[in-house]
């Protein structure tokens, strides 16, 4: 009986925490938002980095010219072509059978899941003597080069990368969020030419994380997020949107609003403010409008843009409010740049919502190597997900 009472009490406490969190988010009323346009109004936002992926999740997939790279559940890097159905390990070692950890495609000693494709090279982070390093691999997997050290890592840390010009930028997106110990969070810049390393930004505090780092034009944009938890309350908020200028070598604050995620394109800044919704700011004319309102099932959203439509994901929000919303409410909302809803696509069976490029929309299912996609040529009416792999990709010990 005591055990049953304890379980019931714990359940009630969890529900109260969730509801307080939900109410705190939605007490945020729509209001006039302030954007510092001075530092972004002349920005050339043409960019070749893959900012369309979900920068607040795992990076186990990267787009290439004709297909995609993917890290399997066995930590093997493979290349697949959706049109042909071909899947091959990314290794060109002579006589390699691709069935053990000596294979170049095996990434089991790296920061888990995170791979990137930039300017015709693959980038990942092997761990050497407890330190995550930046490594560059050619497209075939035949040659690799260590460019420089990043951060201490045990493999489970959430070190992410972003790219801009001739530099990679590394940051920890969540290892210390929710902890009671003070840490200094940093963004580290590494030259892709000579490996020179510089710390361009740092912030010290309890339960902080640098999030959603993306490069546009001359600027590297990012959030700083903070969480607080007590017996009665839990809150997650953003300190705003920041930009590091490569040319000026300084950091400025673009907004102090509670921005969860953002995207820049075609002289517009799109950003989602928690408790309010998705805003669109005209950088040239300095005008802002709310184009999509948040609601009880869609908030704290991540966003992406493929040159045609904006994509809104409520996956993180559903994860935080799992007891209230759960996976059944997970979805992508596809809207045009004026806020008109084009489609809503259920992601009830997804573990991770990845976004995608201009060809396909992706998510990770609950099963092993259950990478699923929707062809964006059918995005206006799409409802059902298709599996990339007919079965788990097992290479070890074949």
Kindly give the residue locations of the regions a language model identified.
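Surface-exposed loop/turn elements that mediate protein-protein interactions on large endomembrane-trafficking
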Residues: 26-54, 76-102, 130-151, 178-203, ...
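N-terminal export/targeting and maturation segments
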Residues: 30-76, 216, 262-265, 270
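Fold-core signature of tandem repeat domains
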Residues: 122, 190, 220, 241, ...
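N-terminal Sec-pathway targeting helices
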Residues: 1-14
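Hydrophobic alpha-helical membrane-insertion segments, chiefly the h-region
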Residues: 14-24
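Residue position within the beta-strands of beta-propeller blades
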Residues: 70-71, 123-125, 169-172, 221-224, ...
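Loop/turn-rich, solvent-exposed surfaces of beta-rich toroidal or solenoidal domains
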Residues: 298-326, 330
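Repeated scaffold domains used in trafficking and secretory/extracellular systems
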Residues: 54-64, 99-116, 153-165, 205-217, ...
